[in-house]
Amino acid sequence: MAAVMSAQAMADAVRVVRASISELGKSAKKSDAFSARDLKSRSGFTESVDRLGLVNLQVQARKKRVRGLRLVPTRVVSAIEGSNSTTADAPVDEDVLAWTKAYRAENSTAITRDETLKSNAQSALQWKCVETQVEGERLHYGRFAVSPFRSGQANTVGVSMQKALLGEVEGAAVSCATFKNVKSEYAAMKGVEETPMDILVNLKELVIRSDSDEPQKAIISAIGPGPVTAGDIVLPPSLEVTDPTQHIAYLTKEVSLDIELDVEKGCGYRMGDHTKSGDGRFYIDSVFMPVRNANYSVHSYESEPDVTQEILFLEIWTNGSITPEEALHEAARCLIDLFLPFLHPKKKEVTNSATKMHKSFTMSQFNSSAEMSAKEVDLRHVYVDQLRIPSKAYNSLKRANINTVSDLLDYTQDDLLSIPNFGRKSVDDILEALQAQFSIDLPENNPLCN
């Protein structure tokens, strides 16, 4: 740091500043800020600035006062060697020396405090897709980077995301197949190269994208000779096959193959109830996992001296029914769903003085504005599709522009019933979902209107 400034040198600088401000005229009076570039262009000012070590000079909005000193209205922003830009009031000449010492002591303390806070604070996490590849219709790859983490945090997030990607992300699969004129899964079918068991294995590997949470029906009705592929399946609008060329069977003669498929949505792997199989209806071990594999790695780096941070890399392979980025978003939302119960406030008992009745309302209905704001921040990021309500109720909410749980809490039960095509059963489904996942009840009508 430069040597301590003399009182006379500081006084010279202050006088130059005053003279420069007066020369700026009306513009300086209208605005509380002036340009350091304008001031430095004045004769004699640069020399004073260089002697004092003041490398930046401008008026600023924040004010610092030194106790016990007489201060004048002139405000100077000083950047002493090695210090941050700080605003202080320039005192009269006789107090310059004391002001300088106090300023330096205060500035030194502020620097130490700022550096400590900077080293302890966590910057906002940022994520980016650094690589993506479509290696085939049924194999998509994506690589993502997330940073900055404090030491140890990246591994925690990596383990959680890997497990959520493999076990929590929903996908669609064939759960049951009903063959026409077939009694046993091992019986040979005339004009069909494969046995029913072989066809069931092929159906198990079908990659299907579903936009509905409800079970769906699909039909295979093909006439030979020739191959039967996924593109031959008659699907409802909510279903789509990822790879239409995926093989199902081969018909060697001019015969028909008729199969009815049950398509469901779920997570992970589910064993079919084979004890119910019979009379041409066969249950399949369903693989709902759209994520084929997920890996993560953690790399450390120094963001600044003695401050170590981490970057997390996530690698995701999907079967093509969803993209790796969609899988990443869904896994994160699943983790949020798992942790939300820990954030639920306890119910408060509120007395209705008009009716002398005690009713229990959630904090989302009656509480302080601060608590309400904190709660709404959480629920603004929870979308209504995460309530896992029937598609009819979900579609009605979307048409009413109710996208999040926070939006939903603005409505009473009577308000919901006034939405077109929204019946009592849909309201009951929503009430059940809100109570199960968030311990929230919607009032029948606005209690403030009673």
Curated annotation (Swiss-Prot):
It comes from the Eukaryota. GO terms for biological process: DNA-templated transcription. One of its GO terms (cellular component) is mitochondrion. Residues 1-77 form a transit peptide. Residues 374-450 are annotated as: Alpha C-terminal domain (alpha-CTD). SMART domains: RPOLD (SM00662). It catalyses: RNA(n) + a ribonucleoside 5'-triphosphate = RNA(n+1) + diphosphate. Its EC number is 2.7.7.6. Pfam families: RNA_pol_A_bac, RNA_pol_A_CTD, RNA_pol_L. The keyword Isomerase does not apply. Residues 78-346 are annotated as: Alpha N-terminal domain (alpha-NTD). Disulfide bonds: none annotated. One of its GO terms (molecular function) is protein dimerization activity. The keyword Lipid metabolism does not apply. Gene3D superfamilies: 5' to 3' exonuclease, C-terminal subdomain, DNA-directed RNA polymerase, insert domain, RNA polymerase, RBP11-like subunit. Signal peptide: none annotated. It is an enzyme of class 2 (transferase). Keywords: Chloroplast, DNA-directed RNA polymerase, Nucleotidyltransferase, Plastid, Transcription, Transferase, Transit peptide. It is found in: Plastid, Chloroplast. DNA-dependent RNA polymerase catalyzes the transcription of DNA into RNA using the four ribonucleoside triphosphates as substrates. Belongs to the RNA polymerase alpha chain family. In plastids the minimal PEP RNA polymerase catalytic core is composed of four subunits: alpha, beta, beta', and beta''. When a (nuclear-encoded) sigma factor is associated with the core the holoenzyme is formed, which can initiate transcription. The N-terminal domain is essential for RNAP assembly and basal transcription, whereas the C-terminal domain is involved in interaction with transcriptional regulators and with upstream promoter elements. Unlike most plants, the gene for this protein is encoded in the nucleus, thus the protein is synthesized as a precursor and imported into the chloroplast. This is DNA-directed RNA polymerase subunit alpha, chloroplastic.
